[in-house]
Amino acid sequence: MKKGIHPDYQEVCFMDAATGFKFVAGSTLKSSETVEFEGNTYPLIRVEISSDSHPFYTGKQKFAAADGRIERFNKKYGFNKKN
């Protein structure tokens, strides 16, 4: 491999902005902030959403009622299943 063309791979602490949940993973991202986590100092990357706050992983997922075209037409013009 050529020297000097690859980014530095290091362990980084990611912190969920919504919940404060932290986890360490390898990354090439750089940060000027650092944080103490589990006895070590890591660069800190703040993320808006992670597995700790995402509805899919937390089980608090909400499903929107997706009406099809026919249902919207029937609702708009007052047709119901009894007619």
UniProtKB/Swiss-Prot annotation:
Domain of life of the native organism: Bacteria
Keywords from UniProt, A to Z, are: Ribonucleoprotein, Ribosomal protein
Cite a single GO MF annotation: structural constituent of ribosome
Query: Gene3D superfamilies annotated for this entry?
Result: Ribosomal protein L31
Biological process GO terms, please? translation
The record's annotation in InterPro entries points to: Ribosomal_bL28/bL31-like_sf, Ribosomal_bL31, Ribosomal_bL31_B, Ribosomal_bL31_sf
Task: Provide the Gene Ontology terms for cellular component.
Answer: ribonucleoprotein complex; ribosome
What does the protein in this record do? Binds the 23S rRNA.
Q: Which NCBIfam families match?
A: L31, PRK01678.1
> Tell me, how does this one assemble?
Part of the 50S ribosomal subunit.
Q: What family does the entry list?
A: Belongs to the bacterial ribosomal protein bL31 family. Type B subfamily.
Protein name listed in UniProt: Large ribosomal subunit protein bL31B
